[in-house]
Amino acid sequence: MKSTYDLRSLNVVFINMPLRETAVPNNMPQGPLLLATNLRDNYGVNATIIDLNAYRIDGRHLTNDEAFCLIQQHFKAHGEPALVGLSGMITTLRWQESVARIVRELAPDTFLVSGGGLATELGSDLFKYIPELNGVALGEGDDIIVKIALDAKTRGWRNAKFVYEGGRPKDLNSIPFADLSLLEKDVFGNELLEYYIGNPIWGASANNSSAASFTMNRSTNFISSRGCPYNCAFCYRGAQGERNYGARSAENLAEEFKLHIEKYGVDFIGVVDDNFAIDHKRVVDLVPLLKPLNIHWGTHARLDESAEFPLMAEAGCVYIGFGAESASPSVLR
């Protein structure tokens, strides 16, 4: 533990929202995992995760009453939280509205913050939809989560509204790998981590945006880079003025590959970057590091980066997802 802040034993709960109902859960929530790992390992925080997205079974997600029961039992088992962080894409607004009411009923004195895609898109306007919130966190949360936890620990925030603006750590290699054991079991003993690992992250059977047919038995996912240097008008990053790109080194990425292979016994890894192939040197450096691991993996890239694809294939890449944003040249311009 390396901290000048006294956050030891602070109870923090991250709640991840459900996404599409038609696909089984196969993409572990990297944001909550990274933040919870950081708070626990570096600051001694008692950080836990409630992953509502893990309960999409047989074409349905949790009902509101089921979510209430799950959150209630989690709070009883781990203690009332000082801080609750909601996380989800912009499509999760209705869920966040409902969960915020549940949290406020069960833990009236908790500091309640929303972060992630929805919060970054709406900013302070999110308070209009979710008045129960004490704070809205914009951008990346690696650094500001400590500030948020410190604010939650004090009692000066009552009746106040906070907007936090997150930046990106200068060295992405310094961020601890997400500890997937935070998802190992829920409060009822359900083995969520094994459920995720057993569901293919991509491929025809995943029933998500990928239609390619290939086989995997155990798969995990993580992120190796953030942002994008391009400024495409049709992309949400361009619309938000985000052109800040950062990537972990090839060596750091290879270490996480090894960890997942050895610890979780996976035969496929999904690197869920927005755009993996931007850095040519990193792709070149990866080949001798990943090739001996004999692991299949997939990621996202642009079609005009196809020069990198043979190198990626040599390193074990068997799947590349790309977005057909528009068939109109004028829109793409």
Where are these regions (language model features)?
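Conserved beta-strand positions
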Residues: 14, 86, 114, 138, ...
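Glycine-rich beta-alpha loop elements in corrinoid/cobalamin-binding modules
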Residues: 38, 42-179, 183
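Structural motif
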Residues: 11, 82-83, 268
